[in-house]
UniProtKB/Swiss-Prot annotation:
<comment type="similarity">
    <text>Belongs to the venom Kunitz-type family. Sea anemone type 2 potassium channel toxin subfamily.</text>
</comment>
<dbReference type="InterPro" id="IPR036880">
    <property type="entry name" value="Kunitz_BPTI_sf"/>
</dbReference>
<protein>
    <recommendedName>
        <fullName>PI-stichotoxin-Hmg3c</fullName>
    </recommendedName>
</protein>
<dbReference type="InterPro" id="IPR002223">
    <property type="entry name" value="Kunitz_BPTI"/>
</dbReference>
<keyword id="KW-1015">Disulfide bond</keyword>
<keyword id="KW-0722">Serine protease inhibitor</keyword>
<dbReference type="GO" id="GO:0004867">
    <property type="term" value="F:serine-type endopeptidase inhibitor activity"/>
</dbReference>
<dbReference type="GO" id="GO:0042151">
    <property type="term" value="C:nematocyst"/>
</dbReference>
<keyword id="KW-0964">Secreted</keyword>
<feature type="domain" description="BPTI/Kunitz inhibitor">
    <location>
        <begin position="4"/>
        <end position="54"/>
    </location>
</feature>
<feature type="site" description="Reactive bond for trypsin">
    <location>
        <begin position="14"/>
        <end position="15"/>
    </location>
</feature>
<dbReference type="InterPro" id="IPR050098">
    <property type="entry name" value="TFPI/VKTCI-like"/>
</dbReference>
<feature type="disulfide bond">
    <location>
        <begin position="4"/>
        <end position="54"/>
    </location>
</feature>
<feature type="disulfide bond">
    <location>
        <begin position="13"/>
        <end position="37"/>
    </location>
</feature>
<dbReference type="InterPro" id="IPR020901">
    <property type="entry name" value="Prtase_inh_Kunz-CS"/>
</dbReference>
<dbReference type="GO" id="GO:0005615">
    <property type="term" value="C:extracellular space"/>
</dbReference>
<feature type="disulfide bond">
    <location>
        <begin position="29"/>
        <end position="50"/>
    </location>
</feature>
Length: 56
């Protein structure tokens, strides 16, 4: 899906949500910390969900 090509967006908020995003350069789902607001679709709660949607 095209959401897998979107850049990682931490957002301006300062909450601490461990999430995963698909890194289009490496072709892998990678952990990052999401701040809690103004993110995009390339933001998954689990590694499994990221891999399932982005086929990593």
């Amino acid at each position: 899906g095209s959401i897998c090509l979107e850049p990682k967006v931490v957002g301006p908020c300062t909450a601490y949500f461990p999430r995963f995003y698909f890194d289009s350069e490496t072709g892998k789902c990678t952990p990052f910390i999401y701040g809690g607001c103004e993110g995009n679709g390339n933001n998954f709660e689990t590694l499994h969900a990221c891999r399932a949607i982005c086929r990593a």
